[in-house]
């Protein structure tokens, strides 16, 4: 049975197109017997990385209460990620990039010596053998264009921690009129239906 960790990051709640598409995929995969864990990074945000937190992420004996709390949360998030086979990320495009809420999660799980390490031949990810599916929604048309910073960024950061099998599902033109919206969502759902857990 596949164990799937789902990350939602839209700030739009019930109006979120990316969350609706994630729900479609979850229903599809649950019928296949997948076990799902959902973390809504907008409804339950993680702290923003700052100087105090960055220093505390290195560990040590003299951490402030805040540093220890965030380090414990980082450990929890990493353990959660490690315990799942597949990572599903809802990544709506906000101003050509991912939501802040998703970036904050990445900042807490990308840790030297824990999810990646440095070797004589360069960095090596420590979370190998996992798969990621990214569902990305956009108001306009950005796929494979210079304005799409989501795909190269997520490919890079996921690959850096060892997750190199990454599939992207796009829902585009969602702010370009009812017909374009319907077509964009239909194409995304069709792509999601072709994926197996």
From Swiss-Prot:
InterPro entries: Flavodoxin_fold, Flavoprotein-like_sf, FMN-dep_NADH:Q_OxRdtase_AzoR1, NADH:quinone_OxRdtase_FMN_depd. Its cofactor is FMN. Quinone reductase that provides resistance to thiol-specific stress caused by electrophilic quinones. Belongs to the azoreductase type 1 family. It is an enzyme of class 1 (oxidoreductase). It catalyses: 2 a quinone + NADH + H(+) = 2 a 1,4-benzosemiquinone + NAD(+); N,N-dimethyl-1,4-phenylenediamine + anthranilate + 2 NAD(+) = 2-(4-dimethylaminophenyl)diazenylbenzoate + 2 NADH + 2 H(+). Binds 1 FMN per subunit. This is FMN-dependent NADH:quinone oxidoreductase. FMN binds at residues 10, 16-18, 93-96, 137-140. Homodimer. Keywords: Flavoprotein, FMN, NAD, Oxidoreductase. One of its GO terms (molecular function) is oxidoreductase activity, acting on NAD(P)H as acceptor. Its EC number is 1.6.5.-, 1.7.1.17.
């Amino acid at each position: 049975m596949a164990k799937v960790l789902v990350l939602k990051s839209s700030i739009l709640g019930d109006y979120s197109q990316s969350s609706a598409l994630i729900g479609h995929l979850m229903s599809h995969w649950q019928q296949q017997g997948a076990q799902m864990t959902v973390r809504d990074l907008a409804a339950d945000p993680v702290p923003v990385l700052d100087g105090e937190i960055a220093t505390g992420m290195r560990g040590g004996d003299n951490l402030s209460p805040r540093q220890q709390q965030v380090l414990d949360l980082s450990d929890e998030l990493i353990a959660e990620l490690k315990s799942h086979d597949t990572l599903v990320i809802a990544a709506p495009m906000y101003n050509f990039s991912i939501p802040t809420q998703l970036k904050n999660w990445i900042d807490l799980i990308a840790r030297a010596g824990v999810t990646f390490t440095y070797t004589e031949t360069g960095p090596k990810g420590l979370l190998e053998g996992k798969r990621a599916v990214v569902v990305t929604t956009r108001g306009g048309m950005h796929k494979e264009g210079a304005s799409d910073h989501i795909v190269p960024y997520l490919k890079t950061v996921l690959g850096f921690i060892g997750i190199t099998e990454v599939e992207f599902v796009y829902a585009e033109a969602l702010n370009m009129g009812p017909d374009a919206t319907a077509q964009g969502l239909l194409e995304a759902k069709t792509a999601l239906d072709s994926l197996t857990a």
